[in-house]
Amino acid sequence: MSNTSIRLKSCPVLISNFINKMKSCIMSCAFIGVSDIPQPDNQTDRKFFGDVAKARIGGVEVILLKPSTLMNLSGKAVAAVSAFYKITPSEILVAHDELDLLPGTARLKIGGGSAGHNGLKSIVSCLGSSDFVRLRIGIGHPRDRQLQIPVADYVLSRPPKEDQELISSAIKKALSCIDEIVEGDFSRAMSILNEKNDPRK
């Protein structure tokens, strides 16, 4: 991923499925550790379909959004905040769970497809663009464990303790380079995320 001078104005949009009701499920992994990001003036606003807060990260004032919608309707919240604060897709960071990455792994990506992720599909549809930045938190795929269960059941299940620890570690590493991410220094952020090899390989 090449470096860029784009600074993010919305960081992070965290998408999951009724987080307060499903704190122990795999899908909720992207929310773990969000309390470590300063969130002054937190407010719930119906027109934003979620909790919104302003914060300063890495010298940049950003908007934090935690949608309260179903995960597959997350785009409604993202589009509402984007329109109200005049934020372009390239200035948005979405943190989400990633089946195609093993637990303990976090990666950055600019644009691209949804890879079957219903939350991303909704955001792309509502924004009319896929050019936002993604912070992908690995949760693994059921096939990694030779589990014969549907993906939908897997992401709603309780992760094993080992995976919980790996996911938590990946999120902490992501938070350690949040300044670089927000300021647009993606090359440096990726270097930090890649410092340690995938613990499951």
Q: Over which residues does each language-model region extend?
A:
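Nucleotide and nucleotide-moiety/phosphate-recognizing core
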Residues: 1-111, 121-136, 142-153, 157, ...
